[in-house]
Amino acid sequence: MVFSYYLFKPFYSAGWRLLNLLHKRQETVFYCHTPVDLEIWLPIQKYLKPIPIVTDKRETYKFLKGKGFSVRKLPAFPKAVIMCRVSAHKFPSQKVIKIGMMHGAYHFKRRTSAKNYLPFSLYMFSSQMDLDNAVSIGVTCGMVGGYPKLDPYLPTPAIPKRSGAKPKLLFTATYDSSGMSGIARWIDHLHELTDRYEIAVSVHPWTNPEYIQRLRAMQGISFIEDNPLHHIPDADVCIVDTSSIIAEICALDKPMISWKIPAARRSVPEVYDIIAGISIQIESFEELAGALDLALAKPAALAQERQQANKVFFDKLDGKAGERVARHIIDLLPENKL
């Protein structure tokens, strides 16, 4: 648990108890850390009574307001909170019921300590294998919920191609400070591809701001500021490293080219093995042209391997994960039933 939990807990807990004496706590809120959390939440919210959104992030507050959502700033003193994080310290009282779920599919980086799950009454994972991994490190509050973020994209939509259109490439990268990113292998070379390909780029929000500034300023590419999931269905090939977006690309059955990334502190060996099996792996940018030719010529070459990986990453890919997660929430908090 982070230090702020212990620092603020006495004051927050006292405030919660006082407010509960004055007016019994009955509200459930959704804590939205980033706009990505909203993408996960909306397919769940439609199966529940309206649940207020709260945040402590200025940019997230501005984003939600700009999209027309009603949102409040922390602190909040609810009966229960739902979140897509392991951020129980934002509500530092044992009296607040806490429900959590993953903000990315599966555990593409080594999981946080089981101690950080202890405040949760329920934490939902994207697949049985993901849950089994959590149990193996000592998590005791887990259930399988699925991955609601994908619901609006299932079944996979068919995107018609414009006649004469260039093939579309989607470059993705996790944050470089993780030691698991491939961004340094391609950022200086994107301009070499723009004549032949349409290029979109998405990077983790924690990526070095200098990289992000450079990408925003580049001519001939589309830098994705929001959810990259919108851009996967019409991509012809996705270029990846070790980010959990790989699971989303896999679910939508798109061919991938991956960089061979050395092991780092938070690497998960079995995930590296899966990535190697579902993608064309390369070491350097010089190998990319040949890999692209192969992926474009035979997009279904690793389709069976992607289907097998989906069984690891996800519970079911039926577009109903939001409904299943909502049922788990209702079992714990029946007052939120529609």
Predicted regions and their residues:
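A donor-sugar binding/catalytic signature common to diverse glycosyltransferases
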Residues: 93-102, 226-268
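Short, glycine/polar-rich helix-capping loops at beta-to-alpha or helix-loop-helix junctions
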Residues: 129-132, 209-211, 265-269
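A nucleotide-sugar donor-handling region in carbohydrate enzymes
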Residues: 2-17, 119-181, 203-207, 297, ...
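Catalytic binding pocket for nucleotide-activated donors in carbohydrate/polymer assembly enzymes
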Residues: 136, 141, 245-313
